[in-house]
Amino acid sequence: MVADLRREARDVEEEVERIRRRAEQDAAEQTERVRREAEQIRRHAEEAAEAIRERAVADAELRASRAEAAARDAIHAEREQIRAELDEDLRTQRTELRGWDSRLTQREQRVTDQAASVEERLRRLETREAELAVREAGLDSRESDLGELEEARRRELERVAGLTSAEARTELVKVVEDQARLDAAVRVRDIEARAEEEAEDRARRIVTLAIQRVASDQTAESVVSVLHLPSDEMKGRIIGREGRNIRAFESVTGVNVLIDDTPEAVLLSCFDPVRREMGRITLTALVSDGRIHPHRIEEEYARAEREVAAKCVRAGEDALIDVGIAEMHPELINLLGRLRYRTSYGQNVLAHLVESAHLAGIMAAELRLPPAIAKRGTLLHDLGKALTHEVEGSHAIVGAEIARRYGEHEDVVHAIEAHHNEVEPRSIGAVLTQAADQISGGRPGARRDSLESYVKRLERIEQIAAERPGVEKVFAMQAGREVRVMVVPELVDDVAAHLLARDVAKQIEDELTYPGQIRVTVVRETRAVGMAR
């Protein structure tokens, strides 16, 4: 069996050998065939490449010849275009040169004509100079003759008139001065009339706008405070045994206590509103507590002093906030707050200052001026009224000195001292302060005046106008708001009437203190009377 297997193995090996030799033979044949095919393909490719190269060379030569022809055509066309442009430029330059030649020729002609004209004028001037020399000689001779004639005429005039030349000159100067004064007065009247018309319209518009934008309540205040009591029995406790309590209260506070038949009420009277307010607070605390005796009165009065001082500071700060002012010296704020308890003709001074500051700020804004200085000066313009009982002098001057002492701007100080014309106003802010003060205090119902001072003011107004020469009658009308002056027409002409109205108004403004404004009207009436018989 092993032998069979070995034979089969040898047979298989032989078969494998045969297959291998056959495969090698087939591979060699196939390789030869492929080589021949590749050689044939290579020859075909070389032939095709040669043909393509020949065609490419031919195409390149053709394109080169075409490009050369196109370049020659382009060069020729560009050369022609450049030649045409050069010809056009040359023609233009020739045209300009011909124009310049023409203008130069014209200018030369004008220069020649001007030279001839100048020569002609020189000849005329020489002739004129000769004529003037002759006339000057004649004028000198005539001037000498005229001088002699003038001297003779002057001597004759002096002989006829009985006046020397100096006296005649003085008389002539006086006549000219009178005429110039009359012309000046007429012109001043016309200028003032036009200025018043324009200024009145604008001022009316500004003031009306300011009043419309400021609406404030106003109540008249008096020098008496009323304190309500829980019962009439409290009046006896206020009086005390043998009047001990009421005497102690009046001596400590400086406030008079008026006890009458009015049920459940007592009156506190004092000209100083600050002391009256401290007395009211003191008595209110005593009545509420029920213990009324001299020692208790002193304690409550000390507490009332501190309370009123705090209220003054708070009132001053509230006024600054209301007006829109950021900073101010603490002492000025305190003095400003004290004005809360002071009145002027029944008008609360602090309320008047706040209202006036708003008015001044609005008017300054309408005039395109910074409102800060106007508001500040107007708010402080009555500052001196807080110290008029303690310092001598008018409240305007005192207030200005206080403001200057505490570092206020000089414009603010000037507005304070000039608001009653004790110092001549030199700035618009001072004039605005005056206007705001007059608007706030002069509107109906803002202030009240006593009958005695009112009558005295009317009498003085009529007296001021009656003292003028040529015045026939004077009438104070409309509660002293208008003065009508009747003049003698033979003594006062139209120009003098205008000057009289201005002088009377100025004197009233300088001498008197009054709310609002006063109109002075001068009436000059000429009557012609004829009798039919």
UniProtKB/Swiss-Prot annotation:
Location of region: Disordered: 16-41
GO MF annotation, one: RNA endonuclease activity
Superkingdom, taxonomy of origin: Bacteria
Cross-referenced InterPro entries: HD/PDEase_dom, HD_domain, HDIG_dom, KH_dom, KH_dom_type_1, KH_dom_type_1_sf, Ribonuclease_Y, RNase_Y_N
EC number of this enzyme: 3.1.-.-
HD domain segment(s): 349-442
SUPFAM superfamilies: Eukaryotic type KH-domain (KH-domain type I) (SSF54791), HD-domain/PDEase-like (SSF109604)
One Pfam assignment: HD
Biased composition (Basic and acidic residues): 22-41
Keyword match Nuclease: yes
Domain KH positions: 223-289
GO (cellular component) term, any one: plasma membrane
GO BP annotation list: mRNA catabolic process
Record keywords, A-Z: Endonuclease, Hydrolase, Nuclease, RNA-binding
UniProt similarity note: Belongs to the RNase Y family.
Function: Endoribonuclease that initiates mRNA decay.
Protein name according to UniProt: Ribonuclease Y
Organism: Parafrankia sp. (strain EAN1pec)
